[in-house]
């Protein structure tokens, strides 16, 4: 015993010295970092304490019990002998409810374990009404802290004791030693079962034991502390057994009113010196004051916690127990004035029923919910429950109808399905800085990949279509397959990527619905459908059969709607997920693949967008397949399109990794029941009215008119409403619609677009005047006519538009109004030239993407090949680009730089290069898909961060100690920087991430957590006043910095060559489209009023068929050649002098501007750009759109000569 006291005194002296030197108590890490002599003392202290406890109760009980027996206080008028607990109470029965109070548990504990050592009567019980328990479990414990010993262990093995003089050894010590010998001779298993039954009340899972200490469950007096058991002056086991459960009440306690949930901080351990110091605050310690420290675990030693017991009792879980947080606070209020908390009566389980006292009348006093307020509250509760159905989240505050452990409404806390290990983890640890999201149902562990449903034959052939496929076909509402559907479905079910080209209305959607249904039947999985338009997604979701559950994710959804959809996806309640390419590629669209069910296959609807829309319009299409393979682990793709030439099909097949097959195409691109006609009228508006009033179109009740510009849709719709309302006579089988014509374009709000489309689908609208945004995915079979006011941009667009008519097989009419002088062709050329750029702008972009660095580290060749700037297999490119890439696909040099994360602010880059954002992103995608893999394009992010501290520089420096990114940012600033002593700091997020080597999301999360802190006593989350702002959206990429000048020139040539090739192809496509329609056009619409011309219609269908069947390399060039100018253009020689004069005048009017030759040509053609917008330069009609009839490239040449002349 002397050795134990000596070791304890030496450890206390070391801890006091540590506290004086460091200003804080030593932690577990400090003990581990202490000298070997100190650590040896801690180990010896632990060993001596364990040996003493096993020998018969320890030093505390062997010395204090004789003093309690021999030095009993004399009876006085007032004293502890008058307490109610001093009277003998009947012993509790073994079958007492678990919901007894803490004193009741102490009574049973003493009766079983220390029955022979009792020095006083047992404690009595007093009925006490139960209060409401805490409705929120504690937060998870951070890593690195050891488990906290349970209260049952402390009471049973090492009971604490009040400071008292050490008595002399007496007879009671010998009785205790003999008792330990007798207990040692018994069966250990029987003893363990006896011990485990007694602390069963506290051995339940922590999540099922609400914290003791709420205002509703304790009787507290301000300024005093409450202890369970006898008074502070009593001696014996009663005082020692419950000394640790005293509660400090001097500070405000957390309340449960107003939706606030109680939380408590925990102390991981307390050293002997800490307990002695806290217990001696009320007065000078006595001789045995250090005895309390013997029972505490030394810092640095792990404590073994009891395994949690399952909460199997079906009774109400809101009983009063002792939580770990209450144990951590035990002993901190020792020495303060006592306030008794009386034991409480166990509550019988009545389920959800509450007994009402009907004998006493109660009246409402004060504010109450009556009439209007009561109805408003009921209305809020109703819509809160419906929030999930409309995309919103559930109630923000846990209500009494839900489980207070996981806030679910399908069970109570007693039947909570959460595992015991998770409950124990959630009940320990500090409050997180950022509130955690609402718990979602856990997805069962699934395989990362989905195996094909059917295997291939020995020679790679498809298996015969089994019966279950036809059964699923009937379940979807179809009796048989249409041409091309069965083979495509079997290929997907066999795991083979497929490109399916079918006419519009031929049932392409079934080819992904049927495989998705069969895959989901076998195992929980997900089918991704990438769709280009929101209206198309809405139409497809509404048209799905009931057996398929579908959901959408797009940019028009709110955050609550997106979270609701993601929660259903994680719970495997969605079979088909439709999303836009921007939602798939962009940041925040989908969670990581590990949090989602495995993807069976991915369907690219309107797959021709991969080839046509991906360049300078929607560059995300260029990265769709790459993201699906690398991020989502997709191996099987299905491409669906109705308009794809051989060239387009080959390009799409390359993206989808589909082997080329001779039967990629289905039937003819234009159905036989469509009657085509073309006319060239000078007054298009009057010709349209004449055609609609003619015999051929007069009785048609569903017509779609397509225009190239939004302004034309509004104007033509107003014209038709004025002129055709009284002239139109409905057909024999239909009734007159409510409205004659309405406009539809992308500039309208979504509600208005849905209204127009719904009216047209229901037959209440006869004519829709729209742009190409209308009709994609339209499922109305009886569209009788499709008209075009102007030249379509391509054959593919025309075929797709006319394919929306006559899907029911009945005759339908299609007419095209062509401008005789090629005015519409000029407008389409403007869009082509708007996407082109100069070589100088490309070179500036390359310099910004590949800045020089000073990397000196090398990497092994195996890592270099897969990193940025390494090599990878060369994909197949079109013939025009294959020759250009052939000399660039040679193996590059070994890279020294492994790549740096860089950010290009979008707005600044757009202004510096005078290029649209889509054009810049397209060039970056070209570099990412290059065989040399020049860079890795990441999701766009906000790069500029500003952090403002209201507490001044002192608070900023204090935050740097807890936030490593902020510390690195302050360390990188120059000492002479005047902002060093300010209360705010601004920095580049991406540069900071690149210098630290962290992930961008981790740095952003660490900076956002600086805005929140915890109240040190209650753990309630509170704001710190720190403001963290992110701004300046930027392209985020990773590129090497050690490229040579030759490599940069090679990249510039590659990018500029791709831009010129795309421009030539687009101009050639326009030229060929105009020539084809011009060859079959009538001079006016007169011959088309009564009946169609079958001969010209057949000729046009043959031209379209040959265009779609052409092989690669047969497409002619599109730039001006020696034969003459393009259609619709004048000769430059006739206008050269006037053009030069106008260029000089334009430059002289704006001498402060630094124009390029392309900028001057754009203004003369009426093409706006970021640096020269149409809103500013379009006001000067002397130059804007003046030379639209001349060649754009000819204007660029003349402007270059004049700029050089001015520079001289």
From Swiss-Prot:
Sequence motif DEAH box, location on chain: 605-608
GO biological process: DNA repair; DNA replication; double-strand break repair via homologous recombination; telomere maintenance; telomeric D-loop disassembly
Catalytic activity: Couples ATP hydrolysis with the unwinding of duplex DNA by translocating in the 3'-5' direction; ATP + H2O = ADP + phosphate + H(+)
Top EC class for this record: isomerase
Signals that turn on the gene: Up-regulated in actively dividing cells.
Subcellular locations according to the entry: Cytoplasm; Nucleus
UniProt feature, compositional bias: Polar residues: 86-100, 273-283
Protein name as catalogued: ATP-dependent DNA helicase Q4
